[in-house]
């Protein structure tokens, strides 16, 4: 029987399945951070259980670390306790930890791929909703809750029901300057923020194949924002070239053998999906969200929509509420909306290609008066690479703040946050009410679009910036 990529990955990891029971899956990699793991380790301790496979468990600090100092006390009492607990737990249970002073420390979904922890064909879990990022490698990756974190630590398995399947095909080539962030925002604009609920999404089509691994990670990172369980891109030569030579990747003949298997991880000819969505890449322009969920998104050249234009009464009410929170009036051009802060970072857009794209816009320009702009590399290696290329100097000379790695302003769990009423052009993944700080107003954009907003003081079409 012809199978989708998701079905192949799922079936290959079933440890036990009985009639009327949820299948038990083997988990190849477990990524851990300071926020969702303390109670899980406490549970192990209470029952006298070890970590079943410490060699398949990797930990880092990211969510509530300071991006201005490596001092563990800098982000408040709760953050300090969580980070100290992680240090204690990893030491006690034999788990590798990339702490604040480790050169590999960074956002968990940046660290995993760049260290070769993430590989095609794997099942990967983490107590974090954006674990879907790793699906860019043709791995089945999804977020789990703290009780499930404990279960995986104890057994290296997890009960998981089968999801429905969705194919999202982006046909043709994207125009120059159109990024993976624009593509995925356009997709969510079409499906809505709940369009993928109950599904695992496979992204395909020429525009997807053209993306680098970093672009594919941006894409899969936001699969969760359309309600999907996970996102997938089938592995190909782009994938294999990225993985080769990384710290935890197979070496020599083992790598060749792995590639031979990874090449089978494609959806079979004739396999059927429960849902199919198609977009034309050439129609996608730079995207900016205007509301309070990622599906409320328009082209940078559009006007703020009028809630009355929505036929669905639920959508209409949602738009009215969103505009009130965002302090926007229907009909005004998006390019006239001024911003207060810019955040370039997060597990969506903090990799080296993202920073290069932002630096290209920032070079030779200055951050607009009254705007605070942060650039937060996703990991120690990304920061080192950017500095080797002189990107930090470009940003600093333009008036951006060059920070230490961490989740930063993506979420209000550390010192980087919005004040009430402040408007931010952000390369992160969520624009919910209060996500970046109580009363903060978030607009999701690509790194180049964020840099353009920083230097102009408002949203601007990067295609018009020479």
From Swiss-Prot:
Q: Which lineage? A: Bacteria, Pseudomonadati, Pseudomonadota, Gammaproteobacteria, Enterobacterales
The record's EC number reads 4.2.1.33
Function, as annotated, reads:
Catalyzes the isomerization between 2-isopropylmalate and 3-isopropylmalate, via the formation of 2-isopropylmaleate.
| HAMAP family per the UniProt record, alphabetical | LeuC_type1 (MF_01026)
Instruction: Report the co-factor binding details.
Output: Binds 1 [4Fe-4S] cluster per subunit.
Question: Which InterPro entries does the protein's record reference?
Answer: 3-IsopropMal_deHydase_lsu, Acnase/IPM_dHydase_lsu_aba_1/3, Acoase/IPM_deHydtase_lsu_aba, Aconitase_4Fe-4S_BS, Aconitase_4Fe-4S_dom, IPM_dehydratase_rel_enz, IPMI_cat
Query: What Pfam families does this protein's entry cite?
Result: Aconitase
Q: Which residues bind [4Fe-4S] cluster?
A: 347, 407, 410
Q: Which cofactors, by name?
A: [4Fe-4S] cluster
Q: In which pathway does it act?
A: Amino-acid biosynthesis; L-leucine biosynthesis; L-leucine from 3-methyl-2-oxobutanoate: step 2/4
Q: Which GO terms describe its molecular function?
A: 3-isopropylmalate dehydratase activity; 4 iron, 4 sulfur cluster binding; metal ion binding
Top-level EC class, please? lyase
| An example Gene Ontology CC term for this record | 3-isopropylmalate dehydratase complex
Identify this protein by name: 3-isopropylmalate dehydratase large subunit
**SUPFAM superfamilies in the cross-refs:** Aconitase iron-sulfur domain
Please state which protein family the record places this protein in.
Answer: Belongs to the aconitase/IPM isomerase family. LeuC type 1 subfamily.
Domain of life the protein comes from: Bacteria
**Chain segments annotated as coiled-coil in the UniProt record:** none
Q: What does the record note on quaternary structure?
A: Heterodimer of LeuC and LeuD.
Q: Which UniProt keywords apply?
A: 4Fe-4S, Amino-acid biosynthesis, Branched-chain amino acid biosynthesis, Iron, Iron-sulfur, Leucine biosynthesis, Lyase, Metal-binding
Biological process per Gene Ontology, one example term: L-leucine biosynthetic process
Reaction catalysed by this enzyme:
(2R,3S)-3-isopropylmalate = (2S)-2-isopropylmalate
Gene giving rise to this polypeptide: leuC
């Amino acid at each position: 029987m012809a199978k989708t990529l998701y079905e192949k990955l799922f079936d290959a990891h079933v440890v036990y399945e009985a009639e009327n029971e949820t299948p038990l899956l083997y988990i190849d990699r477990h990524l851990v951070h300071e926020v969702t793991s303390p109670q899980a380790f406490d549970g192990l301790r209470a029952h006298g259980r070890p970590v079943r496979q410490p060699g398949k468990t990797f930990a880092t600090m990211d969510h509530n670390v300071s991006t201005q100092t490596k001092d563990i006390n800098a982000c408040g009492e709760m953050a300090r306790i969580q980070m100290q607990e992680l240090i204690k737990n990893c030491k006690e249970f034999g788990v590798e930890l990339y702490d604040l002073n480790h050169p590999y420390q960074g956002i968990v979904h940046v660290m995993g791929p760049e260290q070769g922890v993430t590989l095609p064909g794997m099942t990967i879990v983490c107590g974090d909703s954006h674990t879907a990022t790793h699906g860019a490698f043709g791995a089945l990756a999804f977020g789990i809750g703290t009780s499930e974190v404990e279960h995986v630590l104890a057994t290296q398995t997890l009960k998981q029901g089968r999801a429905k399947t969705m194919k999202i095909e982006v046909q043709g080539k994207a125009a120059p300057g159109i990024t993976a962030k624009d593509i995925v925002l356009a997709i969510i604009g079409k499906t809505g923020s709940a369009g993928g609920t109950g599904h695992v999404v496979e992204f395909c089509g020429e525009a997807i194949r053209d993306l680098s691994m970093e672009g594919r990670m941006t894409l899969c990172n936001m699969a969760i924002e359309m309600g999907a369980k996970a996102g997938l891109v089938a592995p190909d030569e782009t994938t294999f070239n990225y993985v080769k030579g990384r710290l935890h990747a197979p070496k020599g003949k083992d790598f060749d053998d792995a590639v031979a298997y990874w090449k089978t991880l494609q959806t079979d000819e004739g396999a059927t999906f429960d849902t199919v969505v198609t977009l034309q890449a050439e129609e996608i322009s730079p995207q900016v969200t205007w509301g309070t969920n990622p599906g409320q998104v328009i082209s940078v050249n559009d006007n703020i929509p009028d809630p009355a234009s929505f036929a669905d009464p639920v959508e209409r009410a949602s738009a009215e509420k969103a505009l009130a929170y965002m302090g926007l009036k229907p009909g005004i051009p998006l390019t006239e909306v001024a911003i207060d802060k810019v955040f370039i970072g997060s597990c969506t857009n903090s990799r080296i290609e993202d920073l290069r794209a932002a630096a290209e816009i920032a070079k030779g320009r200055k951050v607009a008066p009254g705007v605070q702009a942060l650039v937060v590399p996703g990991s120690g290696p990304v920061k080192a690479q950017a500095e080797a290329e002189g990107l930090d100097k470009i940003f600093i000379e333009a008036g951006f703040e060059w920070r230490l790695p961490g989740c930063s302003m993506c979420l209000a769990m550390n010192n980087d946050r919005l004040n009430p009423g402040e408007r931010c052009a952000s390369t992160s993944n969520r624009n919910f009410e209060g996500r970046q700080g109580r009363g903060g107003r978030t607009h999701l954009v690509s790194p180049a679009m964020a840099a353009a907003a920083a230097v102009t003081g408002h949203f601007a079409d990067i295609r018009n910036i020479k």
